Amino acid sequence: MSNQRKRSNDEREEEDDEDAEGIGEWERAYVDDRSWEELQEDESGLLRPIDNSAIYHAQYRRRLRMLSAAAAGTRIQKGLIRYLYIVIDFSRAAAEMDFRPSRMAIMAKHVEAFIREFFDQNPLSQIGLVSIKNGVAHTLTDLGGSPETHIKALMGKLEALGDSSLQNALELVHEHLNQVPSYGHREVLILYSALCTCDPGDIMETIQKCKKSKLRCSVIGLSAEMFICKHLCQETGGLYSVAVDEVHLKDLLLEHAPPPPAIAEFAIANLIKMGFPQRAAEGSMAICSCHKEVKIGAGYMCPRCKARVCDLPTECTICGLTLVSSPHLARSYHHLFPIAPFDEVPALSSLNDNRRKLGKSCFGCQQSLIGAGNKPVPCVTCRKCKHYFCLDCDIYIHESLHNCPGCESIHRPKSVSLMEE
């Protein structure tokens, strides 16, 4: 009997081992739940759940400090008019499931978020999409300023097939970007899944061609570091990085949303002719010059040739005039004069006196900065006006508002000050 029990126990252990080997690493994470990884020890030795908002804010501030350090010292001229092609590797390597549920799904998800963020920060810029399948590069969308058009085209072509060809992708985007105006900054962002590239010719010649045409090529890898990708970025002045997980991939993508420093040849001041079209009347009917279709209502009319276009910003296909709106120029202005990062306030009891002088609440949203047990809540302070802000307002000010409410409240009209005197 004892021998039979031992045999049955051994058989059960072997079955458990086989079941564990049959599931993937990411599936095992769901099975085991790993709930202990979501706990952390506080200053009193007690276990409590991890504060995801604090982690997000720490990541945000690291990115902010990095951008601020790059712009420290002399003021750097930024390329506000950008022409960016996003190249997405949809070869068979994109079907790998080390990123759950697959590399292809994760790339599509974060490229969608990146497109929206890109147009929010760069309203005067344009994006185009290129995919790589079966060793061939395909143009999903031409350069344009409509995020919905790009996202719709991307989500309709999700399929991982064949090998990847980096050279074919570079040749295609070089052909497209070689036609953009000289004042625009030509950029390529490649999301590469494969560990090799199957090219029809010498890719080194293609890289030199991109370098001569002033294409700034950046690569984000999803597998491992490749020499050819690193060489491409070094030659063209781009950035090369490899994502280790989904969160890291998102951070790497968002680093490309703010405009990069302008190339010295393009930093020379010159005038750019632009048109500010009027929105067409709701009931009017006209042929759209960009889609070659009859459309009723929505659209804009070129002030020079009276052609109809759908979205702004864009270039008139009839007369070649750059068409923008005044809010686009206003939203691009903050990149030239970015607001300095706020200083973090350490949570010490000695700071309570200073907080009482300037108030116990956030200057932005009026939320209390004194938590339970009369403990100070983590906050930041502006270097100029010395007002305190909560973490949420800190993110909102630097990502959306681009002005410090405390500093803006100090400046008063001269007429008011003269009346008081």
UniProtKB/Swiss-Prot annotation:
Entries under CDD domains matching the protein: vWA_transcription_factor_IIH_type
Keyword annotations: DNA damage, DNA repair, Metal-binding, Nucleus, Transcription, Transcription regulation, Zinc, Zinc-finger
Domain VWFA stretches: 83-272
Residue ranges, compositional bias (Acidic residues): 11-24
PROSITE patterns noted in UniProt: VWFA, ZF_RING_2
InterPro entries named in the record: C1-like_sf, Ssl1-like, TFIIH_C1-like_dom, TFIIH_SSL1/p44, VWF_A, vWFA_dom_sf, Znf_C2H2_type, Znf_RING
Cross-referenced SMART domains: C1_4, VWA
Main location: nucleus
Subcellular location: Nucleus
Signal peptide positions (record): none
One GO MF term attached to the UniProt entry: zinc ion binding
Gene Ontology cellular-component annotations: transcription factor TFIIH core complex; transcription factor TFIIH holo complex
GO biological process: DNA-templated transcription; nucleotide-excision repair; regulation of transcription by RNA polymerase II
Keyword rRNA-binding: no
Function statement: Component of the general transcription and DNA repair factor IIH (TFIIH) core complex, which is involved in general and transcription-coupled nucleotide excision repair (NER) of damaged DNA and, when complexed to CAK, in RNA transcription by RNA polymerase II. In NER, TFIIH acts by opening DNA around the lesion to allow the excision of the damaged oligonucleotide and its replacement by a new DNA fragment. In transcription, TFIIH has an essential role in transcription initiation.
Family: Belongs to the GTF2H2 family.
Subunit structure: Component of the 7-subunit TFIIH core complex composed of XPB, XPD, TFB1/GTF2H1, GTF2H2/P44, TFB4/GTF2H3, TFB2/GTF2H4 and TFB5/GTF2H5, which is active in NER. The core complex associates with the 3-subunit CDK-activating kinase (CAK) module composed of CYCH1/cyclin H1, CDKD and MAT1/At4g30820 to form the 10-subunit holoenzyme (holo-TFIIH) active in transcription. Interacts with XPD.
PANTHER family documented for this protein: GENERAL TRANSCRIPTION FACTOR IIH SUBUNIT 2 (PTHR12695), GENERAL TRANSCRIPTION FACTOR IIH SUBUNIT 2-RELATED (PTHR12695:SF2)
Name recorded for this polypeptide: General transcription factor IIH subunit 2
Organism: Arabidopsis thaliana (Mouse-ear cress)
